[in-house]
Each structure stands twice: as structure tokens, then as C-alpha cells.
Regions:
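Outer-membrane beta-barrel proteins
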Residues: 35-42, 111-116, 189-195, 257-263, ...
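Outer-membrane beta-barrel biogenesis signature
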Residues: 30-52, 60, 64-72, 190-193
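Transmembrane beta-strands of outer-membrane beta-barrel pores
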Residues: 57-61, 126-132, 208-212, 272-280, ...
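Extracellular/periplasm-exposed beta-strand and loop segments of Gram-negative cell-envelope proteins
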Residues: 64-73, 77-101, 131-180, 210-247, ...
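Residues on the lipid-exposed face of transmembrane beta-strands in outer-membrane beta-barrel proteins
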Residues: 53, 108-112, 124, 186-190, ...
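Outer-envelope beta-barrel architecture signal
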Residues: 47-49, 106, 118-120, 196-202, ...
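Cleavable N-terminal export/targeting peptides
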Residues: 1-42
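Outer-membrane beta-barrel "beta-signal"
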Residues: 50, 57, 384-394
Length: 394
């Protein structure tokens, strides 16, 4: 809901917002809905302080993940089970974009006019969306087959780690990714020209944006094969985690134009924020073995090994331009309804999907032998770009 006070009138606003984020890593394509309530203008002798609250309903095209879980038909040979490209193999989770569903949020905006004619003022806003989450959970006593695919850097071919296979192992795969998105600004506004029903103002201030993703992969595999060299009942718990965060801080510059004709209002806004993205990434993995009542934990999972595990940071120049257009209609004294579009372009956002390297040197799997081979998986801040969009209705 939005409650706004201003002169000469206030009202319901219908905003259609499109936000485009150019990302480092997988993209974030968002579609948003801003659903404010009818608002009424203050009387002529009211104060200069104004406050508004918005309910947001956004959908974000989230993180692009590589294939993470596979299966194969019954009767598939063990060496082909879950292997990408093998006959009958299919992807159960991954090779897709996650966290692109509708989610709710709130935005608060406050401002103050320094003069009674409302030509000079300040304003600030904050928005936050609820956390988006995607889960995958699968368990099997052996059938169906469950596997985690990877590319074997030593054999130079596709391979898979089995969590469930008939007569060999029984287990499960559990994956969860969460995503958050929020932002704020603080602006100084001053009118620079007024010609009849047309008014132009400039903006200068500070802008902040935050994007974060957390991906956790947990697998279990319990040995069911008798005489295979590993005691029956031995359980392997393998964990990989990937976290990515981007924080933008920048100088926001812009101009606003307003045109009124009878009950109609047209407002456009063009801004650009120049600053820096502070990108951070954390990769961790572990393998716990439970056998005969004894438990041992070693560093390294499957896709998070000694070659890429750790904490990383990066600072890069970033640009956040924005173009907005709103149309309003005063349908009663002191009331109006509005609709519009907003386009934001954010460069350099890091996502977890592009932190994942699916090429693995088996010699680095715990217990690591260190017998040579490439340092894979490897870490890198991915520089691919995408076009996240946000649409809004109110």
C-alpha cells in the first residue's frame, strides 16, 4: 500500500517497472508489481514532509545453474549411470534458471520540501523483496538411479558420482538455493526550470543495491554392495556450498520532467548511478564418512575442493542507469491514479551459478592423493552478462 502526501494532488499510482541487471554470472531477470493504494493530497497548510509505502510483487529471472543431478533408466550399466550424453541419461535438477517466480516485497519512501512551492527538497527510499527459494529433494534405495554429473579432467570425458544405484548404494540428493534483492537511495532534488505546465528538476545523491545467492548441495550414499571392499552400511555425506554477493555503491545523477494538462499528468525520470560493485564469493565443501560407529570428516566435497574452496572478493566499476515514465489522471479533487514504466540496467552482478566449475580432477576428491593433474574445479569471477527485467503493476 502507498500513502503519499504532496501538492497539488496525490493519488493511486500504477507503476510498471522493468529492471535490467547486467550480471557477472547468471542473470537476474525480474518482473515486478508495485501495488499502492489510493492517496490523498494534503490541505494547503499541511507540512512539507511526505511519506509513502508500496507493496511489491516481483518476479526475478534468477540464477542459471549447470546440470547438478541426473538419472538413467533401469538396467543402465554402472559406468554409464547418470553420465551426461550417455544413452537414456537425463537431468533431474539444474541446466535451468531458478528463483524466477513471483515474490512479495515492500518499499518505503520519504521526502521533505524546503520551500512552500516545492522546488527544493530531499527524498530517500528503501525496498526489499522476500527471500526466493528453490529446493530439490530426492531419495532412492537404488532404483531410480541418482547421480551427480561432472567432467573428469584426467580421463577427459563425462562421469558421475552415484548416490543411488541398484545393488551398490542407496542415498539422497538435497539442493537448496536462496536469493535476495534490495536497494536504497538518498537524493537531493531542485527545480531548474518551469514553463507554464512544464517543470524540470535535477537529482543528485547516493544509490545502493544488493544481490545475494546461496546454494547448498548435500548428498548421502550408503553402501549396499556385499564384498565390494567397503563395509556394507558405510555412509558418505558430501556437501558443497556456493555463496555470491554483490553490493553496489554509487553517485546517482538525474533529471525529472513533469507536464500537466487538465486532470492529466505526465512525468519522466532519467538517472544514472556511477560507482563500484563489491563482489564476494565463498566456496566450501566437506565429506563425512560414517563406518562401524566411527566418523571422519575431510575438507572437500565434489564440486568444492581444495582447488577452488575459499573466500574471494573483487571490486569493479559499475553503472546503473534508469529511465522511468509515469502517466497520472486526477479523477477527484486531491486524488489521482498513475501508471508507468521503469527501466534499470545494473552491470557486474555476481551469481552463484557461474561460480560452479563442473570439471573435476578425481585426484583432488577426499581423501586427496595429490598425485597430479589439473587444479580443477577452479575459481573465477565470471564476467558473462545477462538482462534481468522487472515489471510492476499497481
Amino acid at each position: 500500500m502507498r500513502f503519499t502526501s504532496f501538492r497539488p494532488f496525490a493519488g493511486i499510482t500504477l507503476n510498471i517497472v522493468i529492471i535490467v541487471l547486467v550480471t557477472v554470472g547468471a542473470g537476474a531477470l525480474a518482473v515486478a508489481a508495485d501495488l499502492p493504494a489510493v492517496t490523498k493530497a494534503p490541505p494547503p497548510d499541511s507540512g512539507r514532509l511526505w511519506v509513502e509505502f508500496d507493496y511489491l510483487a516481483w518476479t526475478v529471472k534468477g540464477d542459471k545453474l549447470p546440470p547438478l543431478v541426473t538419472t538413467s533408466p533401469p538396467g543402465t550399466p554402472q559406468v554409464q549411470a547418470g553420465v551426461l550424453g550417455a544413452p537414456g541419461a537425463s537431468v533431474l535438477f539444474g541446466d535451468s534458471t531458478v528463483n524466477d517466480e513471483w515474490r512479495s516485497g515492500l518499499r518505503a519512501r520519504m521526502g521533505y520540501w524546503f520551500d512552500s512551492r516545492r522546488r527544493i527538497g530531499i527524498e530517500g527510499s528503501f525496498f526489499g523483496l522476500e527471500q526466493a527459494s528453490t529446493e530439490f529433494n530426492a531419495g532412492s534405495a537404488g532404483t531410480p538411479i541418482l547421480a551427480r554429473p561432472f567432467f573428469d579432467a584426467l580421463a577427459n570425458q563425462q562421469s558421475a558420482a552415484l548416490s543411488a544405484f541398484p545393488g551398490l548404494v542407496a542415498g539422497s540428493v538435497n539442493i537448496n538455493e536462496t536469493s535476495r534483492f534490495l536497494g536504497a537511495d538518498a537524493l537531493y532534488r531542485q527545480q531548474i526550470g518551469s514553463w507554464g505546465s512544464e517543470h524540470f528538476s535535477v537529482l543528485i545523491g547516493y544509490r545502493y543495491l544488493h544481490s545475494s545467492d546461496k546454494l547448498g548441495i548435500a548428498t548421502t550414499a550408503t553402501v549396499t554392495l556385499v564384498g565390494g571392499g567397503v563395509p556394507v552400511g558405510t555412509t558418505f555425506n558430501v556437501s558443497d556450498s556456493f555463496n555470491a554477493t554483490s553490493n553496489f555503491h554509487g553517485l546517482d545523477l538525474g533529471i525529472i520532467g513533469e507536464f500537466t494538462q487538465g486532470p492529466w499528468l505526465l512525468e519522466w525520470r532519467a538517472k544514472v548511478a556511477l560507482g563500484a560493485n563489491f563482489n564476494e564469493a565463498q566456496i566450501n565443501g566437506s565429506t563425512t564418512t560414517i563406518s562401524g560407529g566411527a566418523t571422519a570428516t575431510l575438507p572437500g566435497g565434489l564440486l568444492a575442493l581444495s582447488s577452488n574452496a575459499g573466500s574471494y572478493s573483487q571490486t569493479r566499476f559499475a553503472v546503473v542507469p534508469e529511465i522511468a515514465l509515469k502517466v497520472g489522471y486526477q479523477f477527484a479533487p486531491g486524488w489521482r491514479i498513475m501508471g508507468g514504466y521503469d527501466l534499470i540496467y545494473w552491470t557486474g552482478v555476481q551469481r552463484t551459478g557461474n561460480l560452479i566449475d563442473t570439471t573435476v580432477n578425481p585426484n583432488l576428491l577426499p581423501p586427496s592423493t595429490g598425485l597430479g593433474g589439473p587444479q580443477r574445479p577452479q575459481f573465477q569471477f565470471n564476467r558473462h552478462r545477462s538482462w534481468p527485467r522487472v515489471s510492476a503493476l499497481a
